[in-house]
């Protein structure tokens, strides 16, 4: 069962992690109407740097081709829009690592492992803790599915901001791996670690 099917089966369309009344980060499922906005985001310089590079700047048609199948639940990637006080501030996605294809996680054997990626749309909001809140919200949402055993991610070794963000959200470095995008820092959060953190929070 995909995360998206699991969410819709239970009627889950949004998850929020509330830190105070003026700083609530929420996640909602992305829709087809968000594709033009995502296209504009993916062409912003601070995102291009870590999301494909200058040579991979997408056209609107590229974004529609790549992301519409996820929106329509035709593949195992689940796309979200992150919201702050009712305004869209970023994109996140989760996917089943096993069988993800294109050279990704080919040695994975656990169907309960999920991969995640995310971005903040506005450069002015970097370094203010919003990325950590977004990741925490996504992690808790995914672990609401009892079938999920571990969440993993793979920031570039040069993306120190992302690495710090993941560490603050409870991820641990497990070394460097080679991915289709090049070297990456392999970072994980297990269900056991997540539940242990919640018990002592």
UniProtKB/Swiss-Prot annotation:
One Pfam family recorded for the sequence: Acetyltransf_8
Residue stretches making up the N-acetyltransferase domain: 25-192
Entry EC number(s): 2.3.1.82
Binding residue positions for substrate: 51, 154
Keyword Iron recorded: no
Keyword annotations from UniProtKB, A to Z: Acyltransferase, Antibiotic resistance, Plasmid, Transferase
InterPro entries for this protein: Acyl_CoA_acyltransferase, GNAT_dom, N6_acetyl_AAC6
Gene3D superfamilies: 3.40.630.30
Enzymatic reactions: kanamycin B + acetyl-CoA = N(6')-acetylkanamycin B + CoA + H(+)
PROSITE patterns: GNAT (PS51186)
GO biological process: response to antibiotic
Domain of life: Bacteria
MF annotations from Gene Ontology: aminoglycoside 6'-N-acetyltransferase activity
Binding site for acetyl-CoA: 159
Assembly and oligomerization: Homodimer.
Summary of the function given for this chain in its UniProt record: Catalyzes the transfer of an acetyl group from acetyl-CoA to the 6'-amino group of aminoglycoside molecules conferring resistance to antibiotics containing the purpurosamine ring including amikacin and kanamycin.
PANTHER family associated with the record: LYSINE N-ACYLTRANSFERASE C17G9.06C-RELATED
Name this protein carries in UniProt: Aminoglycoside N(6')-acetyltransferase type 1
Species whose genome carries this gene: Serratia marcescens
